[in-house]
């Protein structure tokens, strides 16, 4: 499937998707028009301002009537301990619309209980969510050993394969993981093999804390900024809109005044 990532700058990305015959593919063949917020690398409990940045983001998203749901793509805590997950749960309860949550390496492999507590509190480390005919599929990630290379656990691979097998061939899919699908991910080829069995239109990732486009072996990929403010006065996140045949990414800097 031929796909083009048409534009990239600090504040906007645009994804144009075409079928093999040069005509718009199924993601653009319908009059879909919706938006979602995308947060990643929240790192709750890393800096004194991390909690405030997340709370401000939740309030900002709630105040935007155009946002239909929110995706959080991993490293939502710094050390993955129970108190961090409990605080995260309390903050995320503030969302007035659905949110989809994935763990990253900081959430599941940097503590003794991360692997079990994330699933216990948030019920699952993956999601499959349909919105206006588009399927959003996300699976958990983390190194197989503490401080090891990026890796998607075997149980998540098996789950991903089962979800893709059950997905209609023509249905557009957007895949989400904490790690970019590149050579740094130890089992990247296995993941890409699964993604290419269906109509995967784009892949979203975090981990690197920057807005950037990349080529995931022929599938358009986008890496998102961290919600942390760092040197800015306040944090931010990305707003993603599917409008016709274009998937648009806009950086949102939270306004507090």
Across the structure, where does each feature detected by a protein language model lie?
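Active-site glycine-centered loops adjacent to acidic/histidine catalytic or metal-binding residues
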Residues: 41, 74-75, 104-105, 178, ...
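Acidic-and-aromatic substrate-binding clefts and catalytic sites of carbohydrate-active enzymes
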Residues: 45-51, 76-83, 108-112, 181-185, ...
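N-terminal active-site segment of His-dependent metallophosphoesterases
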Residues: 19-86
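Bacterial Sec-dependent N-terminal signal peptides
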Residues: 1-24
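Short, catalytically relevant binding-site loops at active-site mouths
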Residues: 144, 180-183, 210
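Short, solvent-exposed aromatic-acidic interface loops
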Residues: 250-257
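Extended active-site neighborhood of metal-dependent phosphoesterases/phosphodiesterases
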Residues: 82-161, 165-172, 190-202, 214-247
